[in-house]
């Protein structure tokens, strides 16, 4: 009898050892962060960002290849570091630019898969001064409030956040001087952001304002 129980116990141990860790996590109620959904994006460390001379060009190819071996689509969570002074044109997308190629940043043409930013924080971006053209254009995964109040942004170039249809609010920094690359393109910055309920300047005396300039 003891011999039989011992055999059963050994079999159970062997079976458990082959259960994937992810399956155990799901059964125990823990969330699995694998980047496969917008609700569970992979947090990008600073070394996962392609940064040169204070300019953020995109996501570093080497880091991306390591976290996306299946070369599918992944969702990312990005916190802009304090040392970044500029987000380059298309800097938060996987679209192709010659600057990205030059600075080892991922594009959809690299055969490494694709990505979309599902969470974006500017809380630590105290050195940020410029957000380039089409930086996050067409992103529908980003939700909630785009809060730039901790930054020193003075320029947001044309179409930077156009088509971010699920943003509900924007808080602009007091340092902002230029919205759009020129006066005729100012409206393009948040064009197509259909979910927006308000745009405010940080420190506004009227927190119920739909749009207020300093």
Name every feature range the model reports, one short phrase each.
Residues 1-9:
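Bacterial N-terminal signal peptides that target proteins for export
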Residues 9-19:
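Bacterial N-terminal signal peptides
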Residues 18-40:
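Sec-dependent signal peptide cleavage junction
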Residues 33-66:
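Short beta-strand/loop segment at the start of cytosolic alpha/beta domains
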Residues 40, 44-52, 70-86, 97-130, ...:
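Structural signature of tandem-repeat unit edges
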Residues 57-63, 160, 200, 207:
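Extracellular, surface-exposed repeat architectures
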Residues 60, 65-69, 79, 88-89:
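A short glycine-rich, aromatic-capped structural motif
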């Amino acid at each position: 009898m003891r011999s039989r129980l011992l055999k059963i116990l050994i079999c159970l141990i062997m079976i458990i050892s082959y259960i994937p860790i992810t399956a155990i996590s799901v059964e125990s109620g823990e969330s699995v962060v694998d980047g496969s959904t917008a609700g569970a994006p992979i947090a990008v460390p600073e070394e996962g960002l392609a940064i040169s001379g204070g300019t953020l060009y995109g996501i570093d190819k080497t880091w991306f290849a390591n976290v996306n071996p299946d070369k599918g689509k992944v969702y990312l969570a990005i916190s802009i570091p304090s040392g970044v002074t500029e987000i380059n044109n298309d800097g938060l997308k996987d679209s192709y630019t010659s600057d990205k190629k030059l600075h080892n940043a991922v594009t959809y043409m690299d055969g490494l898969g694709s990505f979309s930013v599902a969470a974006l924080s500017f809380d630590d971006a105290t050195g940020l001064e410029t957000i380039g053209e089409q930086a996050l254009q067409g992103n529908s995964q980003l939700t909630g409030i785009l809060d730039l109040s901790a930054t020193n942004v003075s320029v947001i170039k044309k179409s930077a956040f156009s088509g971010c249809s699920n943003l509900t609010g924007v808080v602009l920094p007091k340092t902002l001087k230029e919205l759009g690359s020129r006066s005729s393109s100012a409206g393009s910055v948040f064009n197509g952001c259909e979910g927006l309920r308000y745009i405010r300047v940080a420190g506004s005396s009227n927190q119920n304002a739909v749009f207020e300039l300093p």
